[in-house]
Regions:
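Short, low-complexity N-terminal intrinsically disordered segments enriched in polar/charged residues
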Residues: 1-37
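A solvent-exposed, acidic/Ser-Thr-rich amphipathic alpha-helical stretch
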Residues: 25-92
Length: 92
């Protein structure tokens, strides 16, 4: 694995952790910044674009006093130029 790939994996991992911070703080601007404009979010029960996901979060998350997302088993693969695939397990 070359240095460029390692740096890309680190940057993608940072995005995953910023996403968790944004969700837990209800900072939807931070959450939005974690997505490419044409990204698809697939949470299993939810699959859609970032605007649809954030709208769902705005309605759903305030039900709880607080959330704390633990991100693990971060697998980043299929890095090819400007595209990559990542799969992450989350416990909230």
């Amino acid at each position: 694995m070359d240095l460029e790939t390692l740096l890309a994996k680190q940057e993608i991992g940072d995005v995953i952790y910023r996403y968790a911070r944004g969700i837990d703080r209800l900072d939807f601007d931070l959450v939005r910044s974690c997505y490419h404009p044409d990204a698809v979010d697939d949470h299993g029960a939810f699959k859609g674009n970032v605007d649809e996901f954030i709208e769902m979060c705005r309605e759903f998350l305030p039900r709880w006093t607080a959330t704390m997302h633990f991100m693990g088993n971060v697998l980043i693969d299929e890095i090819d130029g400007t595209a990559a695939r990542a799969e992450t397990y989350a416990v909230a």
